[in-house]
Amino acid sequence: MLQSNEYFSGKVKSIGFTSSSTGRASVGVMAEGEYTFGTAEPEEMTVVSGALKVLLPGTVEWKVYTAGEVFNVPGHSEFHLQVAEPASYLCRYL
């Protein structure tokens, strides 16, 4: 079953799904902007297109991730994103 989600007044949209190859996951698109997300469980984020500038929990320096790159976010934490142009991602819930 697919589950549509919308955040930040429609600037971030995702579709959640479960498959045998990825497990529980979502794919989404982010418009230009700055966002803060909270996690309930660990997440593995893969940038599909564009770039995400990310500030991970416990770090002080922003890092840019581009298409094909992966970053991990601990559960029960917050991470910050800056998006300069529309970008897409795959988020796996670990």
Swiss-Prot record:
Molecular function per GO: guanosine phosphorylase activity; purine-nucleoside phosphorylase activity; pyrimidine-nucleoside phosphorylase activity; thymidine phosphorylase activity; uridine phosphorylase activity
GO cellular component: cytosol
The keyword Glycosyltransferase appears for this protein: yes
SUPFAM superfamilies per UniProt: RmlC-like cupins (SSF51182)
EC code: 2.4.2.1, 2.4.2.2
Function of the protein: Catalyzes the phosphorolysis of diverse nucleosides, yielding D-ribose 1-phosphate and the respective free bases. Can use uridine, adenosine, guanosine, cytidine, thymidine, inosine and xanthosine as substrates. Also catalyzes the reverse reactions.
HAMAP family, per the entry: Nucleos_phosphorylase_PpnP
Protein family (similarity comment): Belongs to the nucleoside phosphorylase PpnP family.
Protein name as annotated: Pyrimidine/purine nucleoside phosphorylase
The species this protein was found in: Salmonella typhimurium (strain LT2 / SGSC1412 / ATCC 700720)
Lineage: Bacteria, Pseudomonadati, Pseudomonadota, Gammaproteobacteria, Enterobacterales
